[in-house]
A protein has these predicted regions:
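Acidic, glycine-rich active-site loops and adjacent beta-strand->loop/helix elements
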Residues: 50, 62-65, 89-92, 240-241, ...
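Short, basic, glycine/proline-bearing loop/turn elements
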Residues: 53-62, 164-167, 260-265
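Divalent metal-coordination and catalytic microenvironments
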Residues: 9, 24, 29, 49, ...
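Short coil/turn connectors at secondary-structure junctions
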Residues: 1-2, 40-42, 48, 52-54, ...
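Di-metal (Zn2+ and/or Mg2+/Mn2+) metal-binding site signature of metallo-dependent hydrolases
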Residues: 51-75
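Histidine/acidic residue-rich metal-binding segments in metalloenzymes
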Residues: 131-142, 167-285
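Histidine-rich, glycine-flanked metal-binding segment
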Residues: 1-5, 11-55
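Divalent-metal coordination cores built from histidine and acidic residues
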Residues: 69-192
Length: 286
């Protein structure tokens, strides 16, 4: 007898094969049969007329704060999502010094429209380093899996303080320290690094985010940390004001480090063909 059988659903297994009607059998924490007619079970979920699919992986979320206090992570868990990735757009809450907690809350509120009052109430700040933050996530029982990326803006503020907040150029020593911390984060389990270079991301005071004007030397230095760790992807959000220049440095970064570089594909009403053009340029640089 199986532990659970999902009975009579329309199964789409994610491989691209046509849908089939059948059962899915689960024993313990493993799916043991997909399709056909499963035997009896301790629990039967009737799925006639419903789709049965693998859990969705949402690669762009901002649960960085909520994941530290909420085991359910609604509404994602209500809609078939079983894995979420956060630390996107260069915003997050680690690494962090006590004196900069308010700045990181302000960034998240301004960039992602998450109320600062909720973040202030919910965050317990049981961490300083990014590995500490991952440990805090691991201690939280939860209904779905989570993964985190180390965000540029907290990293820059942690290393550079007010100079980082004010978008001053990073010194070689700053870059070396950001690289060291990034490598440590990735080795501890971070899925990569993200930054933002878009004018739509500003603080509540209307200032550009700390990493907006980061020079190529800084970004490459951080990217090398991913190469040294042998894992992780480099992600960014950009306005692509100079498309050729942006793609040129992204290509150099990927070739030098051996790590994948991705960017957020967005569109603009004033440039409706932008997303197609960016995809074409991206393919040309593969």
């Amino acid at each position: 007898m199986h532990d659970i059988v999902i009975r009579g659903g329309t199964i789409l297994d994610g491989t691209g094969v046509p849908a089939v009607t059948g059962d899915v059998a689960i024993d313990g924490d493993k799916i043991v049969a997909v399709g056909g007619k499963a035997g009896p079970a301790k629990r039967v979920i009737e799925a006639d007329g419903l789709l049965v699919t693998p859990g969705w992986v949402d690669v762009h979320t901002h649960y960085d704060g909520q994941a530290t206090w909420d085991p359910v992570l609604a509404p994602s868990s209500w809609h078939g999502v079983t894995t979420i990735l956060f630390g996107n757009c260069g915003v997050g809450f680690a690494p962090v010094r006590q004196e900069h907690r308010t700045e990181l809350i302000d960034l998240m509120e301004a960039v992602e429209d998450i109320p600062g009052t909720a973040l202030t109430e919910g965050l317990n700040w049981e961490w300083e380093s990014f590995p500490d933050y991952l440990d805090a996530l691991a201690r939280m029982p939860r209904t779905i899996d989570v993964a985190a990326q180390i965000p540029h803006h907290p990293l820059r503020v942690y290393v550079m303080g007010e100079r980082g907040i004010n978008r001053q150029a990073a010194t070689p020593e700053d870059i070396a320290e950001m690289s060291r911390l990034t490598e440590a984060a990735v080795r501890a389990g971070a899925f990569g690094f993200t930054t933002s270079r878009t004018y739509s991301h500003k603080t509540t005071a209307g200032e550009l985010v700390p990493g907006h004007k980061a020079e190529e030397a800084e970004l490459t230095g951080i990217g090398r940390a991913l190469g040294a760790a042998g894992r992780g992807a480099f992600g960014m959000n950009s306005d692509f004001e100079d498309e050729a220049r942006e793609f040129a440095w992204m290509t150099r970064l990927s070739k030098e480090t051996g790590r994948p570089v991705w960017f957020l594909l967005t569109d603009r009403p004033t440039d409706p063909g932008r997303w197609r053009r960016l995809m074409q340029i991206g393919r040309a640089h593969v």
